[in-house]
A protein has these predicted regions:
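Conserved phosphate-donor/acceptor-positioning beta-strand/loop module used by diverse small-molecule
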Residues: 119-121
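Well-ordered, non-membrane alpha-helical segments in soluble/globular domains
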Residues: 72-80, 105-115
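PAPS-dependent sulfotransferase catalytic core
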Residues: 1-100
């Protein structure tokens, strides 16, 4: 069974430490069938090991307006990578401490979006 684990990391629960630990131990995780991806997209003031940030992050254009086309492009690119990596791994781990909050406010449909993505495999 293929599983996408999403660590939603509530504040002050050592989420950053978990993310650094997963990155530092990627090879060990990999040998045990767990893939912890680091994506090319970087976000200002966001540590690069918050690999689930693309699930909830806004993208902005040069005028400071939300760029939904760019958001969809990055989401699609990263989800396609995840779907591909399921051909090599049974378990994929994403982590971001903003997911717990975002799913209650501006990204309420995230779980439904991910459920639909799971049907594409």
């Amino acid at each position: 069974m293929k599983t996408l684990y999403i660590h939603i990391g509530c504040p002050k629960t050592a989420t950053t430490s978990i993310q650094y630990f997963c990155n530092e131990n990627k090879e060990i995780l990999s040998k045990n069938g767990i893939y912890f991806p680091i994506f090319e997209q970087k976000y200002k003031d966001v540590n690069p090991y918050r690999n689930g940030h693309f699930l909830i992050a806004h993208q902005y254009d040069s005028n400071g307006k939300i760029n939904t086309l760019d958001e969809h492009r990055i989401f699609r690119f990263n989800m396609d990578h995840i779907i591909y990596m399921f051909s090599k791994y049974n378990n994929i781990l994403l982590s971001d401490e903003s997911i717990w909050h975002s799913t209650h406010f501006f990204k309420k449909d995230l779980w439904e979006i991910l459920r639909k993505e799971s049907l594409k495999r």
